[in-house]
C-alpha cells in the first residue's frame, strides 16, 4: 500500500518511517497541506493522510476518488475538515485518531488553572524580576462554579476532575 501524508510536522516525521516499515507500507511525506494545488501529488497512491488544516471538501474528494484513493485518514481527533457525505458518495473510507478523554480533560484543567491563577501575568513579571503580588492574585478553584456545555466523554472527565478541586459543577 502506498500512502501520501500531507501537512507532516517535524515531530511526526520520526514516527512515520518505523510505522511504515512495521506495517509494510510505503509513505511519502510532505510538509505542504492538501489543497487544490497539491492534490495531484496523490495520483498513484492508495490512501491519503492529512491534518486538521487540510480541507477535504467535495471537490478535493472527487479528484482523490478519480485517482483511485480508497482511504483518507486525519491525524487529528476532529474531522470537520472532511466532507463525510462526499467521501461516502465517492467510496473513500475516512478514519481519525483515537484519543484519551482524560488527556484532553487534563489540558482543559491546565488552561483553567493558568487563567484563574493569572499564570501568564506572573510569568511575564518574573522575566522582569518583578515578584510583587499586586494584580496577579488569582481565584481559588474551590470557590468557583463551573458551567460545562456537554457531558460527553471529555466533559464528564472535566466534571469529575473539577470535583476534586471542590468546584461546583453546573
Language-model features and meaning:
Residues 1-45:
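N-terminal glycine-/charge-rich "phosphate-binding" loop or analogous flexible N-terminal tail
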Residues 136-170:
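Rossmann-like dinucleotide/phosphate-binding beta-alpha-beta segment
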Residues 45-123:
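Phosphate/diphosphate ligand-binding glycine-rich loop within oxidoreductases
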Residues 26-30, 95, 170:
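General small-molecule cofactor/ligand-binding pocket signal
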Residues 8-11, 31-35, 52-56, 76-79, ...:
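Short beta->alpha connector loops
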Residues 41-43, 66, 141:
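A short, aliphatic-rich alpha-helical micro-motif
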Amino acid at each position: 500500500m502506498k500512502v501520501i501524508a500531507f501537512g507532516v510536522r517535524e515531530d511526526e516525521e520520526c514516527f512515520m518511517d518505523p510505522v511504515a516499515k512495521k506495517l509494510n507500507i510505503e509513505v511519502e511525506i510532505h510538509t505542504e497541506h492538501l489543497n487544490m494545488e497539491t492534490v495531484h501529488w496523490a495520483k498513484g497512491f492508495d490512501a491519503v493522510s492529512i491534518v486538521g488544516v487540510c480541507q477535504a471538501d467535495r471537490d478535493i474528494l472527487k479528484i482523490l476518488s478519480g485517482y483511485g484513493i480508497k482511504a483518507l485518514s486525519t491525524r487529528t481527533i476532529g474531522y470537520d475538515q472532511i466532507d463525510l457525505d462526499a467521501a461516502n458518495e465517492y467510496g473513500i473510507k475516512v478514519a481519525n485518531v483515537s484519543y484519551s478523554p482524560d488527556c484532553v480533560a487534563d489540558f482543559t484543567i491546565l488552561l483553567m488553572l493558568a487563567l484563574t491563577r493569572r499564570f501568564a501575568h506572573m510569568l511575564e513579571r518574573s522575566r522582569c524580576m518583578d515578584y510583587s503580588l499586586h494584580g496577579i492574585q488569582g481565584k481559588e478553584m474551590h470557590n468557583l462554579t463551573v458551567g460545562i456545555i456537554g457531558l460527553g466523554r471529555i466533559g464528564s472527565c472535566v466534571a469529575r476532575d473539577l470535583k476534586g478541586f471542590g468546584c461546583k459543577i453546573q
